[in-house]
Amino acid sequence: MKLILENVEKSFDEKQVIKGASFEFESGNIYGLLGRNGAGKTTLFNVINEDLTLDSGSVKLSDEGGERAIDSDDIGYVLSTPIVPDFLTGRELIKFFKDINMKKIPDMKSEDEYFDMVDIAVEDRDRLIKDYSHGMKNKMMMLLTIISNPAIWLLDEPLTSFDVVVADEMKELLKKLKRDRLIIFSTHIMELALSLCDKIVLLKDGKLRLLEQGEMSREEFEAYIIKVLKDETEGE
């Protein structure tokens, strides 16, 4: 399966943020989307998720049936600021999400099995979500994505609110889940991108570009990425 972006453009008033971006993302990979602050990473995610309308270009999915438009069921979008219903308990939310996704998930697990996947403590599972920490709410967002099982995951800096141990646990979980899925992970933390992602994609000057490590060491590759991000004339 591929997510195909062709000449995608998006502007706000007089400012063009995405400038003819084209790229093919393939399933089975975790892509690290890097870019400087204001580069348009969240805008790109919102365009893919159809929260924003394209000015021009196309976003398509290519699978065994050929190319087609993206359906809302294809995408799971985890925002940097979690949006979850505070008036429910964690268990109530998981049960509700299981119920509405029952038909498309053949191997549905119990609520506690899902909680175990993201290491939410037993004593927190029946608490109101309004009493959860920011990191716990982010865990719930990740869990809802796991349950709904979309083909494409858009993760907008979801690990930045976790402590070091939990972030490492979530990284290992994502690595296990990437098979048959396409995960695009937006972050500004270089170490996180290099330790988690299979491929690094830069969003710079409104366009997407794959950076390949080749024979470079990790330190050399990191220095190269920083150089490209800083160099306003690179590739022009």
What does each model-identified segment do?
Residues Y31-R36:
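The feature captures the beta-strand-to-loop junction immediately N-terminal to the Walker
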Residues W153-E157, F162:
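Catalytic Walker B motif of ABC-type/P-loop ATPase nucleotide-binding domains
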